């Protein structure tokens, strides 16, 4: 992975074999990001995404392997209990045009990933809501 920062914008290239969440965390830590939005596209060879079941208050994960194009990868970087926290969603399509997506648990790049991180001047933490079962923004 390589990246360059331009004021409040970080442009990154995540390389073949690298895992997306690990690389985003590395950038967040290196740049001391407290709040940011994330956008990306690229190609993945394997990924796991989840769908939150509100009645059960838990995610159900689905894993995929093969040639997939990232149709959309979006989300936020912020903090929870003082630690960096990344919340990303991803959709990826196969050669038949079928698209699979959800909350990103894991994604390994098969060719390249082009990412833009917009750093926001501020800080938003998270807290775990027992009622909802998710880590929500805390202002």
Residue ranges and their predicted role:
Residues 1-86, 91-139:
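N-terminal intrinsically disordered, cationic/polar leader segments
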């Amino acid at each position: 992975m390589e990246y360059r920062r331009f004021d409040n914008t970080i442009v990154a290239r995540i390389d073949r074999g690298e895992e997306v969440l690990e690389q985003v965390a590395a950038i967040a830590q290196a740049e001391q990001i407290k709040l940011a939005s994330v956008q990306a596209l690229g190609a993945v060879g394997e990924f796991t995404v989840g769908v939150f079941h509100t009645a059960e208050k838990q995610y159900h994960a689905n894993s995929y392997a093969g040639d997939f194009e990232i149709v959309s990868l979006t989300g936020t970087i912020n903090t929870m209990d003082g630690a960096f926290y990344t919340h990303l969603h991803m959709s990826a399509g196969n050669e038949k045009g079928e698209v699979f997506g959800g909350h990103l648990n894991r994604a390994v790049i098969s060719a390249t990933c082009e990412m833009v991180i917009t750093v926001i001047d501020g800080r938003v933490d998270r807290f775990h809501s027992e009622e909802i079962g998710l880590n929500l923004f805390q202002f």
